[in-house]
Amino acid sequence: MTKSLPLLSNIAWASRLVWRSGPCLTILSLVLVVMQSVLPLLGLYLLKLIVDEVSTGLAASAKTASFSGITYLIFLSGCVVLIDRVLGTLSSLVATAQSLAVTDQVYGILHSKSNEMDLEYYENSDYYDTLHRAQQEAPYRPTRILNGLLSLAQSSISLLAIGGLLLTFHWSVPGFLLVGALPVLLVRFRFAKKLYIWSRRRTPKERQALYFNSIITGPVHAKEIRLFNLGDIFAERFRTLQNQIRQERLSLITKRSAAEVITQTGGIIPAFVLYGFLAYRTLHGQMTIGDLVMFYQAVQRAQSFLNQFLGSIADLYENNLFLANVLEFLALKPKITDTARPKAVARPLQSGIVVHNVSFHYPGSDRPVLDGISLRIRSGEHIALVGENGSGKTTFVKLLSRLYDPTAGAITFDGTDIRELSLRDLRQRISVVFQDYAKYHLTARENIWLGNVEFPPREDLIVAAARQAGADKAIAKLRAGYDTVLGKWFENGEELSIGEWQKVALARAFMRNAEIIVLDEPTSAMDAQAEYELFKKFHKLAQGRTAILISHRLSTVRMADSIYVLNNGKIVESGTHDELVSRGGNYATLFETQAQYYR
């Protein structure tokens, strides 16, 4: 009983999804199913009448009258066939429309769930396996369950009708046919479970094969692939994985096919026994020729409908197993969430931001990226974080914007732990340009507007943000200005240099007009002078706002009110530029080393 509950639960979920995607289409599908289920029985009955009428006409003297009746019955039979064909075409049209609607809705559900997931999930390969399986199954499994339910309903109605007819011949006939067909169902059940278990085991291999395919065909690795002649190596690895997957699947399918052939061979024996019994009764005058034809056709139809009925049950079982992959993904819960009663972030900040003895390590690792750091950022203050790669600078920004929560310690805004603040409100108050900023293959206008989608894309604000970031000159050179698609993925797109992409990302940050703005190595592709000019301009534009600057070039952070030097996840020095230089510590040594290259 407990095993059947997930099956019913999953089918119920898929049914609700299908209904929400189009109630009218669902009702129309059910009506068509009922109509198509009744027509075969009507066709059989008309066939019996035609045969009996022909038999009677052969013995009668009034051939014309008999032919007139036969013609009328043939006309009715033709109408039944025509209606069946029309209903079949209409059913196909409705099924296609509903399938498209369901697919769109499922993608919406997947996208919504993906947006909820924390960055922590992206540190775990199991998450990628779960996501991959959900993406594979989600577009069509609910629709297959719908089609399976409709097929089950249609075959059930047809079976009841044909079964009722066969009962008039002998009460044991329906059960006799069922016994012969059941072994096929058991084989389908068994191998559906085997296929499902295998498909879960193959996921890592399949993802790895897709990864090698993306390396070969995508633009990210294109230069190195050609420069180092790596194409054949990755293509061979792709082929090896694909061959393994194909051989494993073929082995499983071959075993299933062999088992089905054996069971199907046994399944046809009851039908031929019944054919012999029908012929025997007809020869002994216990049935008319019309009865023989009708019951002969009825046995054939019953076997066909029974196979369809049991096949629908097997398909529902298999699709239910694979639908569990989708529901497994949808069952994931974000860990960065609002409290029951989240608080609003103060506008504007009063006392500022305080970091209390914060430590953090990434999931699956015991190495602390941040180790007991404490600092205070006053409202409107401009600070800088400097240090070698891997010292924890970017991680600090992720904690500040609650992309992760600290392993220990707390971060407060005006004395309130940010975990108690509204997550949406907190992130609206912070604008970040990460070192690995996004490149959206959209228009230049959209690229900048995405920094503040709470408002319509006003031209004056977009242009102002572009000017502040220095992106306006690059955009002015484009074929269609702000309406030019950036990147080469789509038609008429134009590629930017790395430095120009960085300026567009900066414009996106300025567009947000947030009270707290963070620049995480946003100018790494600019030369030292361009970076200095940008930071100087930024320092002026950010007056009255809290700013956090992260840069590997110490000459560009000299204007910061306070500078914090991180090393191995700890703050080892802090102060103004002049104070740190005068102390002769790590900062002074690094500053002097860099200064030698610009003298």
Where are these regions (language model features)?
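Membrane-integrated ABC transporters
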Residues: M1-P40, L58-L73, S91-A95, S112, ...
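An intracellular "coupling" helix at the cytosolic face of ABC transporter transmembrane type-1 domains
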Residues: R20, Q135-I145, I197, R201-P204, ...
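Transmembrane helix-loop-helix hairpins at lipid-water interfaces of multipass membrane proteins
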Residues: T26-L90, I162-L195, I269-G276, Y280-Y296
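Alpha-helical transmembrane segments of polytopic integral membrane proteins
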Residues: L44-V51, Y107-H111, N124, Y128, ...
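Cytosolic ends of transmembrane helices, especially the final helix of ABC transmembrane type-1 domains
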Residues: L230, T254, V273-L274, V293-A331
